[in-house]
């Protein structure tokens, strides 16, 4: 069984989403001793943002400069990692009301027409269903349903939309919020998220 672990936080060891996503992977490793884990630290090794040159360079028979060809091949590798994974664990902090740009760059490499989705007479159809996706969303403030800032939350809502678009309609989402509201609030949020991670089903 293959697991892809993706972290989008820029905060390293101070990151709540990284702490919780790592705990999830550790739990799944313990439950599945033969688990094959691929890890992408999108802050430590950022992916280049998608460009017109790369889109053109990915077309059949394209003639590319070495830099563009490297970027095209990197995009293919990222896509293949995602397609091969049966489980995907995503650490997704909320930065300025949305995902980190590093995580968005990864998403742009896995949303590929004809591979993870396609357009037909009835609109878009997801082609990447069947995966188990577990996302950890960390938020400094309070953005949950019913809060004054709920409409400004574009990390969890965006992730759910993107995943549904490619056929993953039931992701498991763990939220840690209020982590910037003081040390006690941070500890409560982290503890609650770790408890939720420990309660995840084995498979």
UniProtKB/Swiss-Prot annotation:
TM helices/strands, residue ranges: none
Cofactor note: Binds 1 FMN per subunit.
Keywords per UniProt: Flavoprotein, FMN, NAD, Oxidoreductase
Residues noted as binding FMN in the record, renumbered to the chain: 9, 15-17, 138-141
E.C. number: 1.6.5.-, 1.7.1.17
Catalytic function, reaction form: 2 a quinone + NADH + H(+) = 2 a 1,4-benzosemiquinone + NAD(+); N,N-dimethyl-1,4-phenylenediamine + anthranilate + 2 NAD(+) = 2-(4-dimethylaminophenyl)diazenylbenzoate + 2 NADH + 2 H(+)
InterPro entries: Flavodoxin_fold, Flavoprotein-like_sf, FMN-dep_NADH:Q_OxRdtase_AzoR1, NADH:quinone_OxRdtase_FMN_depd
EC class of the enzyme, as a word: oxidoreductase
Cofactor(s) required, per the database record: FMN
Highest rank taxon of the organism: Bacteria
UniProt key word Transcription regulation: no
Single GO molecular function: FMN binding
Complex and partners: Homodimer.
Family membership noted in the UniProt record: Belongs to the azoreductase type 1 family.
PANTHER family reported in the protein's UniProt record: FMN-DEPENDENT NADH-AZOREDUCTASE 1 (PTHR43741), FMN-DEPENDENT NADH:QUINONE OXIDOREDUCTASE (PTHR43741:SF4)
Name of the protein in its database record: FMN-dependent NADH:quinone oxidoreductase
Gene: azoR
